[in-house]
Amino acid sequence: MNTIVSIEHLEKVYTARKLFDDTACYIGEGEKLALIGVNGTGKSTLLRILAGEESPDGGELIVRKGLQIRFLSQNPKFCEDETALAACLRMAGGEVSGEDTTAAAKKLLAALGVTEPDLACETLSGGEKKRIALAGVLLHPADLLILDEPTNH
């Protein structure tokens, strides 16, 4: 197995409560992994740590050098006055200008059921917003795709 992520003895504590302790996991190239558990067990926290958006309190996280990681958070942030297309492009990050990127974003949004990319986000449902965020994450290639509750709406 060609390991792209190695987690050893990972710890996270919130206000004197250990969320997880001595957690270990190895993710190989091409593997799929699902975290399943009850609320409050640290699944989202572990994913934020993997994505580099939060730091562990102990242990070791080794990510293969140059690994392209794309992360869809559980609660993506929206600017209510922006359009679905603008939100998708903003969430895509990186180089998002140009006709090719805009066309690809529109195609991806349509494939995910967002058929009116010029509507303001404030008029959209939670599920539509989640699909817009997913399109933004999928717009650029990634070696590791981290999706935190991508279908919870």
Identify the meaning behind each predicted range.
Residues 27-29, 63:
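Conserved hydrophobic segment flanking the Walker A/P-loop of ABC-type ATPase nucleotide-binding domains
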Residues 145-149:
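Catalytic Walker B motif of ABC-type/P-loop ATPase nucleotide-binding domains
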Residues 51:
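Helix-to-loop junction immediately C-terminal to a conserved catalytic motif
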Residues 2-3, 9, 67, 73-136, ...:
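ABC-family P-loop ATPase nucleotide-binding domains
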Residues 5-15, 61:
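Conserved beta1/A-loop at the N-terminus of ABC ATPase nucleotide-binding domains
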Residues 23, 36-38:
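The feature captures the beta-strand-to-loop junction immediately N-terminal to the Walker
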Residues 5, 20-22:
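Conserved structural motif at the start of ABC-family nucleotide-binding domains
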Residues 33-35, 47:
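Short hydrophobic beta-strand immediately N-terminal to the Walker A/P-loop
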